[in-house]
């Protein structure tokens, strides 16, 4: 037998090769290879190819040797082949990056994607055209609420579909960056076209009708909501510990999610100090007479940092009525929405989404000539750009009023 190629050994009845990988000498037996001159030469060629792949950063241990115990120890990330496996590993990694609330919503979205795409689908088979087909299915197909089948309906909103597809593209981008797939099917996938919805604020006449139809806490709640611009999750989570009636300010540092979990406001800019307009301050002073002396309740606050929670004892500004002898310490976001719908109906004014209390705040301040940067800071937006994007059409409609105001001030 001729001299063995570099890195090739004969061990009993088997041919074995060795190579250096990550600073360690690795040995792999070529099972099923008979000891012949031809196979020894092939083993030398295989070993040379592996060395080349290692040097060029292309070597995938478990692809070359799927059953290797050495490879299983050397490789820290397992090879992912199916969509279900991709969802599992992505979720495990993202749990340390996303807040508990965001993770819950994401897992709910993944349940739907797992059904539509099918868990056993090889991720290497997913093409650009498949993503577009999944998008159509999400847009026109039936919703898949497994916990509450009665709520299922045909179709989803464009915004919801865009969120699902953004999540899917994020998964596939992760798969590409991890070397699980060699193509980029997510490239070029665009958002569906959406019409910009023009804000529909309450008129002063409608607001007065709302105030006349409400009394007590309900009147205080909606008066404060309209004149402070807080998000409804921030309203529900507002505690007297956040309020300074002397200085006329509210420190917004807590939000209640739709999943009934307390955490920071939506963005870092959402943690802010709101300087109260006089009507908002008056509403809080009246509300203090109703709930300012209630006992504190303990809640769990979920920080953005993974795994960090905090117990907080608070007495909330707005509290539900006693029901069946029990007093819940705060409103849920959905119950605030229900109270808004009931109040609008009692007032006999046109129905709007509850979020329009916030739109009304912004539009009224713009009409009064407030600086968009100031409005953005009060509402918890990162920059004034958000105000221009959301209320741009409203601002354009105010041009004539702005000219009249400038003429009056400059004359």
From Swiss-Prot:
Molecular function via GO: DNA binding; site-specific recombinase activity
Domain of life assignment: Bacteria
Gene3D superfamilies xrefs: 1.10.150.130, Intergrase catalytic core
Every Tyr recombinase domain range: 197-404
Keywords noted in UniProt: DNA integration, DNA recombination, DNA-binding, Viral genome integration, Virus entry into host cell
All residue ranges annotated as the Core-binding (CB) domain in the record: 81-176
InterPro entries: CB (IPR044068), DNA_brk_join_enz (IPR011010), Integrase-like_cat_sf (IPR013762), Integrase_catalytic (IPR002104), Integrase_recombinase_N (IPR010998), Min27-like_integrase_DNA_bind (IPR022000), Tyrosine_recombinase_XerCD (IPR050090)
CDD domains attached to this UniProt entry: INT_ICEBs1_C_like
One biological process term in Gene Ontology: symbiont entry into host cell
Catalytic residues, chain numbering: 231, 266, 358, 381, 391 (o-(3'-phospho-dna)-tyrosine intermediate)
Pfam families: Arm-DNA-bind_2 (PF12167), Phage_integrase (PF00589)
PANTHER family linked: PHAGE INTEGRASE-RELATED, PROPHAGE INTEGRASE INTR-RELATED
Function: Integrase is necessary for integration of the phage into the host genome by site-specific recombination. In conjunction with excisionase, integrase is also necessary for excision of the prophage from the host genome.
The family this protein is said to belong to: Belongs to the 'phage' integrase family.
Protein name: Prophage integrase IntR
Organism (species): Escherichia coli (strain K12)
Taxonomic path: Bacteria, Pseudomonadati, Pseudomonadota, Gammaproteobacteria, Enterobacterales
Gene from which this protein is expressed: intR
């Amino acid at each position: 037998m001729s001299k063995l190629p570099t890195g090739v050994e004969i061990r009993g009845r088997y041919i074995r090769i060795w190579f250096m990988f990550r600073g360690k000498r690795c040995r792999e037996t070529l099972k099923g290879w008979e000891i012949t001159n031809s196979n020894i030469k092939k083993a030398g060629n295989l070993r040379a190819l592996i060395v080349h792949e290692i040097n060029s950063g292309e070597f995938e241990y478990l692809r070359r040797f799927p059953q290797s115990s050495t490879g299983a120890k050397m490789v820290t990330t397992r090879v992912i082949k199916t969509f279900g496996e991709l969802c599992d590993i992505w979720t495990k990694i993202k749990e340390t990056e996303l807040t508990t609330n965001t993770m819950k919503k994401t897992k709910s979205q993944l349940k739907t994607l797992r059904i539509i795409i099918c868990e056993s689908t090889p991720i290497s088979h997913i093409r650009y055209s498949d993503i577009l087909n999944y998008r159509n299915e999400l847009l026109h197909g039936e919703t898949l609420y497994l916990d509450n089948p009665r709520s299922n309906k045909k179709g989803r909103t464009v915004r919801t579909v865009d969120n699902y597809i953004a999540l899917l593209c994020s998964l596939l981008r992760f798969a590409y960056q991890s070397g699980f797939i060699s193509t980029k099917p997510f490239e070029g996938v665009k958002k569906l076209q959406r019409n910009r919805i023009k804000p529909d604020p309450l008129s002063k006449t409608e607001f007065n009708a709302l105030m006349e139809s409400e009394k007590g806490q309900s009147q205080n709640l909606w008066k404060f909501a309209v004149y402070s611009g807080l998000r409804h999750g921030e309203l529900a989570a507002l505690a007297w510990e956040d309020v300074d009636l002397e200085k006329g300010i509210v420190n917004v540092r807590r939000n209640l999610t739709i999943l009934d979990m307390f955490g920071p406001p939506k963005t870092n800019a959402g943690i802010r100090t709101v300087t109260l307009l006089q009507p908002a301050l008056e509403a809080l002073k009246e509300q203090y007479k109703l709930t300012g002396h209630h006992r504190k309740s303990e809640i769990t606050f979920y920080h953005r940092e993974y795994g960090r929670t905090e117990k907080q004892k608070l007495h909330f500004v707005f509290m539900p009525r006693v029901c069946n002898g029990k007093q819940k310490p705060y409103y849920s976001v959905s119950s605030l929405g229900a109270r808004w719908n009931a109040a609008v109906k009692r007032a006999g004014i046109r129905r709007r989404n509850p979020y329009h209390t916030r739109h009304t705040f912004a539009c009224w301040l713009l009409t009064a000539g407030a600086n968009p940067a100031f409005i953005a800071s009060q509402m918890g937006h990162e920059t004034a750009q958000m105000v221009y994007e959301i209320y741009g059409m409203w601002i354009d409609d105010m041009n004539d009023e702005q000219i009249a105001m400038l003429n009056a001030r400059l004359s």
